[in-house]
Amino acid sequence: KKDGEYKTGGVWTMDKMGFKYGKLEVCAKFTSFQGGWAAIWLMPQERQYPSVNNSYPGEIDIMEQVSMDKIAQHSVHTHYTLDLGYDKNPPRNGYGEYRDGEFNIYGIEWTAEKIIFTVNGEETFSYPNLHLPNESLMQQWPFDVPYYLILNYSVGGEDAWPGPIDDRGLPAHMEVEYIRYYEKENKGNDDDGDEEIPEDLIKNGGFEDTFAEGKQPGVFMSGDIEWDK
């Protein structure tokens, strides 16, 4: 808090690196206090249904923790779940326990059929693709395009989800030990594997094991990533 205003922030990979399918893990710990809001989430680089104007083009909340809750919340937000109100068939959110004040691993395993959410390697929630015949209208599964990763720590307020802010909990922070991303060796496409890898990628930084070219975990951009104000 500075000059009577709350300052929050985060980082993202928008226009730097997108994720589509595979396994994504973030090892992080964060401060929990009344009014705090830690989040690890994904938004689409581009809409899967660009011709349709709706409020929710797709969102995958790998982890959200608010105030003094001792659970990590997982959610998906789509036109189907929010605009149309189908939030229980199938359920759009779930919960997992985490170790407060310690590093925990929050992840997803994402395929064309479902998204499985995990905490410390344990499955805590999953969301399936229903393959609706009118999918382009219902938009239950806008998850077949690349998404970018967002890590941020916000605070609430009287009308916000975390509720009133207790200034005694400040300053608050999120600390990230690593981000790891894995892809299946055979993704079922015609990619010949000759795609040029940008020079500003960190490949397998700090890991002792040797991985096949292009298959290293934790491949992410090394350039500065600024949170949009």
Where in this protein do the model-derived segments appear?
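Extracellular and organelle-lumenal recognition/adhesion modules and their flexible linkers in secreted
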Residues: 193-229
